[in-house]
A protein has these predicted regions:
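Peripheral, non-AAA+ core regions of ATP-driven protein-machinery
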Residues: 1-218, 222-232
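Conserved ASCE/P-loop NTPase catalytic core
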Residues: 205-277
Length: 277
């Protein structure tokens, strides 16, 4: 039986839809085509263990998987979940009625737990652009993806939840986040604030000019003069992000895997203060 499941490939800070076609027929071999990398090819062993650990049976048949578009390299273990769902659906263990409505992404552990992925936000944006009803992703990434409006984002912890949801046995509650409220909630919250600095008026003025105009600044002085202390606080006087800039910043952190667990929209301007040593 031929089925189609939908995932996404991240390129840069954007995503594109990947169609995963799975066909089960008589035989005993497993084939995967469509330019998968080593991590994607290794998904077979993870899927077998995850499926059978949760009481399902991996098909003892010839399984052919095609990931299109075939000219785009598919990288990482985030395709484990859509591959597993496609294989079980092709073996008639999962109903196919909902498969065209949802995009799925997630890495599987051997016990069927669904592990975090990179690029959840650009994947969610692409899912909405392509008209999908919802996105099923790891629970650790759900707040990050839920900043996308007009898309049902479901966070799951185990492959059994996904199977039962697609079979209509349980209902999952989508995570809803007020994007603007989330943006303004952390808008002016800083662990280190420039107002903590007492004195040093001329240096503070130089910092303000540099921050407002986007200029470089170099600090020279003896140890203990306050150089590092002031440099750490410059982020609190940098121009605030717009909502669009916040989305772009969050996409970059998402793709790089730098999002903290449970975080959503990054509303503070990125800042790095490397030590001269």
């Amino acid at each position: 039986m031929l089925v189609k499941v939908f995932g996404a490939a991240v390129q840069g800070i954007d995503a594109l839809v990947v169609t995963i076609e799975v066909n089960c027929s008589q035989g005993i071999r497993f084939f995967m085509v469509g330019l998968p990398d080593a991590a994607v090819k290794e998904s077979h062993e993870r899927i077998v263990s995850a499926v059978e650990h949760n009481g399902y049976r991996f098909p003892r048949k010839q399984v052919i998987v095609n990931m299109s578009p075939a000219d785009i390299r598919k990288e990482g273990a985030a395709y484990d979940l859509p591959l597993a769902v496609g294989i079980l659906a092709s073996d008639e263990k999962i109903e196919t009625g909902k498969l065209s409505e949802y995009m799925l992404m997630g890495e599987l552990s051997l016990d069927g737990s669904i592990l975090p992925i990179k690029g959840a936000l650009p994947i969610a944006i692409k899912a909405r652009e392509e008209g999908f009803k919802g996105l099923i992703i790891p629970k650790a990434n759900v707040r990050e993806a839920a900043v996308v409006n007009h898309l049902d984002v479901y966070g799951v912890e185990n492959i059994t939840e996904v199977i039962r949801f697609l079979n209509g046995e349980i209902e999952l509650e989508p995570t809803v986040i007020d994007t603007r409220a989330e943006f303004f909630r952390e808008y002016t919250h800083f662990d280190l604030d420039f107002s903590d600095v007492k004195g040093q008026e001329s240096v503070k003025r130089a910092f303000e000019v540099a921050a407002a105009g986007g200029h470089n600044i170099i600090l020279i002085g003896p140890p203990g003069a306050g150089k590092s202390m002031m440099a750490k606080r410059i982020a609190s006087i940098m121009p605030p992000l717009t909502l669009q800039e916040a989305l772009e910043t969050t996409k970059i952190h998402s793709v790089a895997g730098k999002m903290e667990r449970g975080s959503s929209l990054l509303s503070q301007r990125p800042f790095r203060a490397p030590h001269p040593t």
